[in-house]
Amino acid sequence: MTMRIFNFSPGPATLPEPVLRQAQAEMLEWNAVGASVMEISHRSAEFIALAKGIESDLRCLLGVPDDYAVLFLSGGATTQQALLPLNFAAPGQTADYVVTGHWSKTALKQASPYVNINVVADGERDGFQDIPNRAGWRLSKDAAYVHMTANETIHGVEFRQTPDVGDVPLFADFSSSIAADLIDVSKYDLIYAGAQKNLGPVGICVVIVRRTLLERTGQPRADIFTYASHAERDSMLNTPPTFNWYLLGLTVKWMLAEGGVQEFARRNQAKAQLVYQTIDQSGGFYRNGVAAAVRSRMNIPFFLPNVEQDARFAAEAKAAGLLSLKGHKAVGGIRASLYNAMPLAGVQALVAFMHDFQQRYG
């Protein structure tokens, strides 16, 4: 039997082995219906019951209040970034964007054809090594919403607290940190998250939105681009990615069985601490310049003394069963992604490899 490696990919990311094994066992026949879950109608009583159960489990996992709709939509976060202004900003209105890394810049770019953009804070001036202090943010007077990216996978910075933006709706991309730590959903008006990091496979996106927001007119658009239409049809306005939805449900059940978000917050802090300690105690052989208060627990970028060492590290790590550690092309270096499904044993193996590599080449 082939041994599974430790997969540090930033997304699509490692999935819990129990989830994969259950999906494997149910591949040919699910729930005694005589067919795979990916073969049955999304409008069948069996699948509708499955979908309702998954929503209930996700609400339990994240503590989603009743006055929020939970949507399961095709695609990923980038699609939502374009849909936000179409749904919630009137023509000619301004939206505020907090820029803390590559993905918040992407969100701004996707929204810019449909809304006037005000950059309230820009971490690029400091190389995205810190999150600009809230006291210096330049919020608009009548913004349609404020947008933030909770965790930046490439630059490795993370909001540890929810920023106070007053009465303006706060929208957040939680793709890479949803269910990784406890959050108060009620402090946000809309949360969106591509599933492929902590919630399941690529191809499905969760949107959690305050129901009163769905009453906004926004801009002219088709029903398929309208959150209210998806909410009215229980995320089945069009044929949904049923197998992805099913896998997301298995992943959520696994997280609940393991102790919920509180337990994963504990695990994630412990895993990240192991890697950061190894970096900080390496005498400069490994470098991470992110301000300590905003260091990401999900994505840890670091650099060796030169690009040749970076390449050697990634290649030897792969040979040692540590996959996908090469940094993003935008910044280079090395990146370890430690999502919920990454076991402590994988992080311990990485840290042991880091020590060994430094002994041999440091």
UniProtKB/Swiss-Prot annotation:
GO terms for cellular component: cytoplasm. L-glutamate binds at R43. GO terms for molecular function: O-phospho-L-serine:2-oxoglutarate aminotransferase activity; pyridoxal phosphate binding. It comes from the Bacteria. Binds 1 pyridoxal phosphate per subunit. Pyridoxal 5'-phosphate binds at A77, T78, W103, T153, D173, Q196, N238, T239. Its EC number is 2.6.1.52. Its main location: cytoplasm. The keyword Cytoplasm applies. The modification N6-(pyridoxal phosphate)lysine is found at K197. It is found in: Cytoplasm. It is an enzyme of class 2 (transferase). Keywords: Amino-acid biosynthesis, Aminotransferase, Cytoplasm, Pyridoxal phosphate, Pyridoxine biosynthesis, Serine biosynthesis, Transferase. It catalyses: O-phospho-L-serine + 2-oxoglutarate = 3-phosphooxypyruvate + L-glutamate; 4-(phosphooxy)-L-threonine + 2-oxoglutarate = (R)-3-hydroxy-2-oxo-4-phosphooxybutanoate + L-glutamate. The keyword Transferase applies. Pathway: Amino-acid biosynthesis; L-serine biosynthesis; L-serine from 3-phospho-D-glycerate: step 2/3; Cofactor biosynthesis; pyridoxine 5'-phosphate biosynthesis; pyridoxine 5'-phosphate from D-erythrose 4-phosphate: step 3/5. GO terms for biological process: L-serine biosynthetic process; pyridoxine biosynthetic process. Its cofactor is pyridoxal 5'-phosphate. Homodimer. Belongs to the class-V pyridoxal-phosphate-dependent aminotransferase family. SerC subfamily. Catalyzes the reversible conversion of 3-phosphohydroxypyruvate to phosphoserine and of 3-hydroxy-2-oxo-4-phosphonooxybutanoate to phosphohydroxythreonine. This is Phosphoserine aminotransferase. It comes from Xylella fastidiosa (strain Temecula1 / ATCC 700964).
